[in-house]
Amino acid sequence: MDKIAVYIHGKDGNVNEAEHYKPLFPQYDVKGFDYKAQTPWEAKKEFPSAIRSLCKEYESVTLIANSIGAYFALHSLAGQRIEKAFLISPIVDMEELIIQMMAQAGITEGELKKRKEIYTSCGKKLSWEYLCYVRKNPLAWNIPTEVLYGESDHMTSCETISA
């Protein structure tokens, strides 16, 4: 085959989820990318070389990415040889998500800046470094993309996806 569809999972997902997409892309080799990155700056180091290596033998590259995996892909793969992307409930505005999480936890920006890291009551870590990074590094994506947005998606609003 000369076509590959690379699947990038979301948080707590795994490379085996790529199997779900094989029937949807019958003319492609479908492979999952199992990454270690936990932050966008780690993804920016890890994703480009890994995707180039995975795709080097193929003429056509399609990306399928989910949730935070989609955000990491949007952040790190804009300059890669990808013909089309399919994003499933992607996080597309990390700053908005962090601010929303801070508001839900009753944490001010000043408090986060002072403490650097705060764990919310539901166990999620809020990080001043992460917030500053996403503000300084906005997404710049120029690859043709289709988005599948779930009506029960609580991470990204419909308005944000539509913008």
Residue ranges and their predicted role:
Residues 54-59, 141:
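Glycine-rich phosphate-binding loop signature in dinucleotide/nucleotide-binding domains
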